[in-house]
Amino acid sequence: MSDVSSSVACVVVDYHAGAALTGCIDSLHANRVTNIVVVENGLAGSTPPALGARDVVLVEPGQNLGYGRGVNRGAAATGPAEYLLVANPDLVIHDGAVAAMVAYLETHHDVAVVGPQIQRPDGSIYPSHRVFPNLWLAGAHALLESPWPQNPATRIYRSPRSDGTVDWVSGACFLIRRSVFEEIGGFDERYFMFAEEMALCWQVREHGYTVAGVQEAVVTHIGGLSRQRAPRVMIIAHHKSALRFEMQTAKGLRRLLLPVATLVLGLRLFMALTVRPKAPIEEV
């Protein structure tokens, strides 16, 4: 297996994560990842200044680029590497997780993107390996998940295939072949935040590659640190990205029903802003 320290470059997009970012960098170093670039998407000087002493390259664009554009900027600043690891700043990568993902890619040559098992701080599993949603499936899942956790829509949405492949993995942490990342042009920068990982995995699959989850690789995601600063902005961005993905991928009857889907999503956004504007946001 390739040596992690020479084969993996990592990009972390920071938005006021504070001490959590330091913990993330420590866990990367524990996994022998040393080629690390942090992109400061928050206010100038908001990223902990001690990162320089940890051999981390800091990219300071002077503005919030959005997540996908930030990763693209960071990837361009990394040193040579066969694989690109994308990680949220509020993430702790368990020992051996990066090596497990590298090993999977080296033994599954048709797979271009892998995601780890993501745990919440309480140890519960976050469903980070999913099928591509449409507004109808995602809507049914969002409405039924709380009162009926095992409803058909949620089971379909969160079920990996028997061979371990999935449609997409969470953007909180994933490993992608650098050559494929460059082949598809990186993240679609029209997505400011939310659904950008779905769009990336869609492009990966459109180019003939597959996506998979690696249960042996485990990370813990604190979650929500960036979103707590501007919940209303995040809610709006979430819905805009969901609509963009539907417009990008809908075919046949789904495309004919786009006006209806747009209306439904608009009503859902209105309710989210007026009824529960401070509710936590998870990917639908």
What are these model-predicted stretches?
Residues E60-G79:
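Glycine-rich, basic loop-to-helix element that forms the pyrophosphate-binding segment
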Residues D26-N35:
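Short, acidic, metal-binding catalytic loop of nucleotide-sugar glycosyltransferases
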Residues A81-V92:
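Short beta-strand-to-loop acidic/aromatic patch adjacent to the donor-nucleotide binding site
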Residues R161-S162, D167-V218:
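A short, conserved alpha-helix in the catalytic core of glycosyltransferases
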Residues W202-A279:
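Active-site-adjacent helix/loop segment of glycosyltransferases
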